[in-house]
Amino acid sequence: MREVIFMFDCCSCNQDMNVPAEDSGPRPSVINIEKATLQNSNFRMAIWTGEHLQLTLMRIPAGGEIGLEMHPQLDQFLRIESGTGLVKMGCSRELLSFQSSVSDGCAILVPAGTWHNLINTGSRPIKLYSLYAPPQHPHGTVHKTKAQADAAEAQQDH
């Protein structure tokens, strides 16, 4: 017996959507993620925070970096929309044995407990979006700069 599956696009993504002004989670949402990512001017901005998942936008300036970090209890997915960089990962902060050049269209998958950093090696900002499961940052987080992000994380003991 043959099984036929029909798939329908029940929602259309408004191509004119701008960067969300605030975190819309946990309400149901549809956004143009590529456009929102490219328009983002903040170092980090949480645009949707649910109970088990969080979506953030990031802008890493030329010569900048996310900063070496490790999330013991969550997996992370990053998607580069523009820019070029070098991602480093490993089992300890001293042993980052995995390295790869990344650019537009690359997806970076970071397992829980893995030390990682993304360094901008290009002349323009890296624009990316990141999914955390479970959420990593407080609902509504906006850090205009890496310095603000570092200060907030120091207060939260990340």
Put a short name on every predicted segment.
Residues 35-38, 94, 119-158:
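Double-stranded beta-helix
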Residues 57, 87-89, 128:
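Short hydrophobic/aromatic-rich beta-strand segments that constitute the beta-sheet cores
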